[in-house]
């Protein structure tokens, strides 16, 4: 698209005349907002109106969200949780929501400050990579779908071994994917194991496919004390498509050779029948999936930076995941500084940023939200909605550039109108003089 403007309604003619005299009119505002009432927000404690505490603080002082929105029915939020955390771990909140314009303000509840590792000598950096890949896919798909929810994935395993929880740290225990223990009749982990699972009821599903990226030692009962290279895949029984990958790193789970941890890829799968296959080590099966329903016309999601005050370590994985054209990232330039609750809740600038949810705007773009659809000094990049006409800044005042055709037509019509007015004035003046002469 060039920097020419689409013809506007006649009422904007005055704006055309005055735009060179006005500087800074209808600039983009750094807020998250919506074009109409068809929106939804996914959040954590900073937008959780149901959180209850008895510490003498003012009511709802932990919110960055305006309390007027608490009863809007357009928010799914849980203190201490996030979509990533609920997707992978037993600490689960059933995030469910639907809207055309989707906003995310969560993610900080799984950050480097938690330092999660699957194994004692594991690597939290791998989990930060998992987080970035998860949100990148989630944002991309929610620019195309209205509805998000969680579903349980049923599976059938023909062996006698049971699920095992080998990936846990402090208060978090991984349960997606599910790990199946080694069958007792095998001496080591060099065997093929498989299980069937079914995906149904949604347009598409987001599921994890994970491997321990490195050399995994078998159990203490393994007489050979062998190390294994993890290999996992999902096979679509209906279509014949295979998804899979192997571990590639030369790391282990010892103090001398640390770094072994779970690396996850995130897949978008269609409804159908699948087979999970492990060629070595533990079999993994998806136990939960994000259910995507109701396709919509492409509409970028808006993501608000989810971070702690600088006294606690944060990450930038949601910023890494939020990329054009499917995502607009919103942030403030200052350190997060909470108010009466604590330093991590109730930041003044983030409250301003989220105050845009109280009203509709005309246009949402990369630079922010535009209140009006008439004129702006900034061209809306990746604009959605009824976006303003372009106006370039030149010298000391803006110079408005419009599509020349409607401007020429307006000039012709204005010239004709002037000629008609002059003709009528002369006609009535001549008519008046004739009548005076006859009198």
UniProtKB/Swiss-Prot annotation:
Modifications the protein undergoes after translation, according to the UniProt entry: N-glycosylated in the host RER.
UniProt xrefs under Pfam families: Hema_esterase, Hema_HEFG
Domain of life the protein comes from: Viruses
MF terms in GO: host cell surface receptor binding; sialate 4-O-acetylesterase activity; sialate 9-O-acetylesterase activity
Subcellular localization, as worded in the UniProt entry: Virion membrane; Host cell membrane
Intravirion side: 429-439
Disulfide bond positions: 49-70, 118-167, 202-291, 210-264, 322-327, 363-387
UniProt keyword terms in alphabetical order: Disulfide bond, Glycoprotein, Hemagglutinin, Host cell membrane, Host membrane, Hydrolase, Membrane, Signal, Transmembrane, Transmembrane helix, Viral envelope protein, Virion
Region (Esterase domain 2), start-end ranges: 282-395
Active site: 45, 342, 345
Membrane topology category: Single-pass type I membrane protein
Membrane topology (Virion surface): 23-407
Any single Gene Ontology cellular-component annotation: membrane
Catalytic activity as recorded in UniProt: N-acetyl-9-O-acetylneuraminate + H2O = N-acetylneuraminate + acetate + H(+); N-acetyl-4-O-acetylneuraminate + H2O = N-acetylneuraminate + acetate + H(+)
Annotated spans, Receptor binding: 133-281
Segments of this protein annotated with the region Esterase domain 1: 12-132
Single biological process term from Gene Ontology: fusion of virus membrane with host plasma membrane
Residues listed as glycosylation sites in the UniProt record: 94, 196, 246, 309, 316, 331, 360, 374
Keyword presence, Acetylation: no
Stated family: Belongs to the influenza type C/coronaviruses hemagglutinin-esterase family.
Record's subunit section: Homodimer; disulfide-linked. Forms a complex with the M protein in the pre-Golgi. Associates then with S-M complex to form a ternary complex S-M-HE.
Function noted in UniProt: Structural protein that makes short spikes at the surface of the virus. Contains receptor binding and receptor-destroying activities. Mediates de-O-acetylation of N-acetyl-4-O-acetylneuraminic acid, which is probably the receptor determinant recognized by the virus on the surface of erythrocytes and susceptible cells. This receptor-destroying activity is important for virus release as it probably helps preventing self-aggregation and ensures the efficient spread of the progeny virus from cell to cell.
Protein name: Hemagglutinin-esterase
Natural source organism: Rat coronavirus (strain 681) (RCV-SDAV)
């Amino acid at each position: 698209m060039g920097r020419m403007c689409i013809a506007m309604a006649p009422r904007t003619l005055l704006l055309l005349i005055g735009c060179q005299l006005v500087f800074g009119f209808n600039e983009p505002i750094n807020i998250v907002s919506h074009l109409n009432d068809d929106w939804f927000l996914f959040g954590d404690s900073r937008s959780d109106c149901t959180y209850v505490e008895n510490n003498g603080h003012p009511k709802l002082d932990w919110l960055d969200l305006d309390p007027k929105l608490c009863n809007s029915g357009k928010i799914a939020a849980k203190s201490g949780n996030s979509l990533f955390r609920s997707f992978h771990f037993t600490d689960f909140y059933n995030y469910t929501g639907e809207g055309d314009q989707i906003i995310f303000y969560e993610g900080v509840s799984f950050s480097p400050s938690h330092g999660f590792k699957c194994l004692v000598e594991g690597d939290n950096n791998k989990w930060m990579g998992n987080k970035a890949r998860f949100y990148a896919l989630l944002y991309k798909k929610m620019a195309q779908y209205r509805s998000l929810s969680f579903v349980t994935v049923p599976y059938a395993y023909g062996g006698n071994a049971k699920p095992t929880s080998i990936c846990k740290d402090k208060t978090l225990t991984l349960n997606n994917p599910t790990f199946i223990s080694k069958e007792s009749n095998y001496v080591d982990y060099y065997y093929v194991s498989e299980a069937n699972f079914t995906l149904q009821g949604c347009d598409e599903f987001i599921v994890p496919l994970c491997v321990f990226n490195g050399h995994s030692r078998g159990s203490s009962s393994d007489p050979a004390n062998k190390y294994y290279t993890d290999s996992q895949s999902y096979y679509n029984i209906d279509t014949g498509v295979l998804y899979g990958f192997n571990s590639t790193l030369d790391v282990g789970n010892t103090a001398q050779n640390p770094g072994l941890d779970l690396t996850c890829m995130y897949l978008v799968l269609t409804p159908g029948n699948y087979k999970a296959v492990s060629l070595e080590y533990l079999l993994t099966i998806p136990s939960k999936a994000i259910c995507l329903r109701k396709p919509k016309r492409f509409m970028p999601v808006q993501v608000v930076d989810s971070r702690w005050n600088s006294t606690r370590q944060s990450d930038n994985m949601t910023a890494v995941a939020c990329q054009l054209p499917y995502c607009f990232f919103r942030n403030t330039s200052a350190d997060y500084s909470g108010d009466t609750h604590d330093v991590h809740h109730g930041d003044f600038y983030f409250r301003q940023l989220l105050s845009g949810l109280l009203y509709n705007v005309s246009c949402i773009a990369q630079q922010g939200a535009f209140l009006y659809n008439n004129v702006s000094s900034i061209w809306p990049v990746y604009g959605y909605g009824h976006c303003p006409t372009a106006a370039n800044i030149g010298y000391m005042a803006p110079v408005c550039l419009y599509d020349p055709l409607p401007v020429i037509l307006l000039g012709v019509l204005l010239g004709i109108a002037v000629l008609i007015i002059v003709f009528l004035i002369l006609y009535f003046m001549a008519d008046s003089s004739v009548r005076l002469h006859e009198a």
